[in-house]
From Swiss-Prot:
Species in which this protein is naturally found: Mus musculus
Record's keyword terms, sorted: Calcium, Cell adhesion, Cell membrane, Cleavage on pair of basic residues, Glycoprotein, Membrane, Metal-binding, Phosphoprotein, Repeat, Signal, Transmembrane, Transmembrane helix
GO molecular function: calcium ion binding
Membrane topology (Cytoplasmic): 637-790
Residue span of region Disordered: 260-291
Glycosylated residue positions: 255, 399, 437, 455, 536
Biological processes, Gene Ontology terms: homophilic cell adhesion via plasma membrane adhesion molecules; Notch signaling pathway; synaptic membrane adhesion
Topology in the lipid bilayer: Single-pass type I membrane protein
Functional description taken from the UniProt entry: Cadherins are calcium-dependent cell adhesion proteins. They preferentially interact with themselves in a homophilic manner in connecting cells; cadherins may thus contribute to the sorting of heterogeneous cell types.
This protein's encoding gene: Cdh6
TM region(s), chain numbering: 616-636
Alphabetical list of PROSITE patterns matching this protein: CADHERIN_1, CADHERIN_2
Positions with biased composition (Polar residues): 269-279
Keyword DNA damage found: no
Lineage, opening ranks: Eukaryota, Metazoa, Chordata, Craniata, Vertebrata
Protein's recorded name: Cadherin-6
Amino acid sequence: MRTYRYFLLLFWVGQPYPTFSNPLSKRTSGFPAKRKALELSANSRNELSRSKRSWMWNQFFLLEEYTGSDYQYVGKLHSDQDRGDGSLKYILSGDGAGDLFIINENTGDIQATKRLDREEKPVYILRAQAVNRRTGRPVEPESEFIIKIHDINDNEPIFTKDVYTATVPEMADVGTFVVQVTATDADDPTYGNSAKVVYSILQGQPYFSVESETGIIKTALLNMDRENREQYQVVIQAKDMGGQMGGLSGTTTVNITLTDVNDNPPRFPQSTYQFKTPESSPPGTPIGRIKASDADVGENAEIEYSITDGEGHEMFDVITDQETQEGIITVKKLLDFEKKKVYTLKVEASNPHVEPRFLYLGPFKDSATVRIVVDDVDEPPVFSKLAYILQIREDARINTTIGSVAAQDPDAARNPVKYSVDRHTDMDRIFNIDSGNGSIFTSKLLDRETLLWHNITVIATEINNPKQSSRVPLYIKVLDVNDNAPEFAEFYETFVCEKAKADQLIQTLRAVDKDDPYSGHQFSFSLAPEAASSSNFTIQDNKDNTAGILTRKNGYNRHEMSTYLLPVVISDNDYPVQSSTGTVTVRVCACDHHGNMQSCHAEALIHPTGLSTGALVAILLCIVILLVTVVLFAALRRQRKKEPLIISKEDIRDNIVSYNDEGGGEEDTQAFDIGTLRNPEAMEDSKSRRDIVPEALFLPRRTPTARDNTDVRDFINQRLKENDTDPTAPPYDSLATYAYEGTGSVADSLSSLESVTTDGDQDYDYLSDWGPRFKKLADMYGGMDSDKDS
C-alpha cells in the first residue's frame, strides 16, 4: 500500500499580533485525491486530528521592521514520516533561503534572521522538502509556500519636488488654479491608513488655499496687485494616516509669482514740454524726447505715441523708441522760420494691449502739450526748380542764349546771389552763365552727333556770405539739324562675270546718316553725272534706302578693262539737302556657268588670307639656309682663333698680359701687328727714345734673338701692307693692338706724349713708320713744324 506523506505547516505569530493564514487552492497533480489533514496551531502544541482535506495552508505572514533581539519566528514544517528519531532532514530553498530565512533541519522551524522591509520586497517565495538523512532521498514531494511581509507605517509622505514654482495673474478671481502639489507614501496603500495622505497649508494664508485630498493650490484673496506685492511663499504639508494623530508628514515650499496684467494706464510726468530746432533741420532730424511712465511690465508697459491735435501735425512726427519706450519728436517737413516760428502739438501716449475686463479702471492713455520753437539760420539760395531742362540747335552760334536759371535767398535779408558753372561738369567750357541774371549761353560750337546731352551743374552763391551756396542740375539737349550727308554703310567692292547678261544685279547698296530726322531717313541713289552717260552699269533705286547695281550690256572683257570705278551719289530728303559721292569698285572676273568667280585680278576676293603651300616651303628653305650660314660663320671664326699646329722654333714671341685690365677682351691680348716685331728700326727706337722723358724707368726685357730669315720677313711684311691698306678687309684679318699700354710694347705708351704747347722740340715723324694704324696721328702731329713755319 502506497504511503502518503504530508507536510505540517505551522505559523507562529508573535505578540501582540494575531495569527494569519490563507488557504491554498486544491493541488491537482502529484498527490492522490485523499490527503491527511494538517492542523495549524499557535505556540502550544495541540493534538493533530486526521480529516479529509481539499486545501493546503501554504502562506505565512511576517511583520516588517522587527526590532527584537532574537530571530523572528516564521512557522514550522512537519512531515507525517517524521517519527521524531532524527531520521528526516528538512531543507529550505528559494528567496532568501539560508540568508534571510533559516530552517531547523531536525524540527522544521523557520526563522527570519534580519529585519525585513516591505518597501524593498513584499513577498518571498520558498520551497521546502523532507529527505532521508541517511540516504538523502526525499520522503515527501517538494512543496512551495509564500511569506508575505505585513506593512507598518514607517515611511513619511515625500513630495515629488522640494520646491515648486508657479505663477498666477494678478487681480485673479478667488479660486483661480495656481498649481498642484503631489506627495507619495511608500507604505502599502491596501493595508490600513499608512499611505493615505492629506494636504494642508502651513504658510500662505489668507492669499492661497489647498485642497486636502488633491493638493491643488488656489487663490483665496481677491484683487491681489502685483504692483503692491509680487512674490509669495507658500508651505504645504502632506500627512499620512489620513491626517490623524501619530501620522508621519512631509513639507514642500511653493514660490508663487503674480504675473502682470494691463491694469495701469500710462501717465506723463508733466503736462507741457518745450523744444527748439533750427529751421535748417532736414526731415527725420530728432528734436526731443518725451516719456510716459507705466507701472506695468513687459508688453503691458508698451506705449505708442501719436500726435492727435495741434497746428504742426503736418510738420512734425513722433515715433516710439522700442528700447526705452520714449516718444521721439522728429521733423517731418522742411521748416521755414520766415513762415512760422512756433508750433504747438498735442501728443498722446496709449497702451496698444488693453484687457477689456479692466476698462472700468478708466482710459488707458494720457496726453501732453509739446511746444516747438524754430530758430532762424542763414540759409543758402533756393532755385526756382529742382532741375532745369533746356534745348538748343546744334548749329547755334557762339554766345547764343539757351535759357536761364533763377535762385534767391530765402532769408529775410534777401542777400543778392551770383551764378557760376561747376567746371567739373563742363570740362571743355562749352557753356557759360551770366553771374548776375543766370542766363545760360554757348561758348563753343555744338555737335549733336558728338554729344546729344550735356549735364552741367549751376551754383548759386550769396555775395555777402560765399559759404552759403546751392547747386542745381541743368540738362541741355542738342537738337539735330541736317548737317551730315548720307554715306555708304560699308566699303563696296564687287565683281562682274565676263559672260554677264544685261540688267543683271551684281550688288545691293545701303547708306547711313548720322543725323536723326523726325520723319526718318529717306535716301536716293544715282550715278554721278560724269559717269551716268558712259558707264557700263546702272543704278536702280529701290525706294527703301537701298539701291542695286545692274549691268548695262552683255559681256565684259577683263583683259580690256579689269576694274570699273562707279561714283554713286547719295542724297537725303531733309532740309537742307545733304549728299555725298561714294565709289563702288567692280572687278571683271572669269566665272563658271553658275556665276561663281574663278579668277580675276582681285585675288583677295576669292583666296582666303594666308600663305600657300609653295610660299611656306620657300620660307622654310630660306630659314634653313640662314641657319647653315650662321653655323659656318661661327665655325670659321673659331678656327681662325686656334693656334697653328706647327710653330717654328725660331719664332719666339712673348705677350705681356694684364689680367685686371678691363679692355676689349680676347682681341686686345692676341691681336697685334706682327710687322713691328720684324722691324729692327722700330725695335731699336723703342730701346732708345731720346725725344720722350719716361714717367718711370723700366728695364727693357731681353728676348732671344731669332735667326734672320729675310724671305719670310719680306713675305709677311708684304701681306700685312696689302691687308692694312685694303679698306674692305674684314677686321679679324688684321692683328693689331691699339689700346694696350703695358711695358715691353714696341710702340711704347701713348701716355708719355706731351702737349705741343709745352714742348715744341718733339719730333713725331717716327709715327709714319708704325704703319697705317697710326697714320691719323702722323698726319696730326708730323707736319706741325711746317705749319708753324708757314
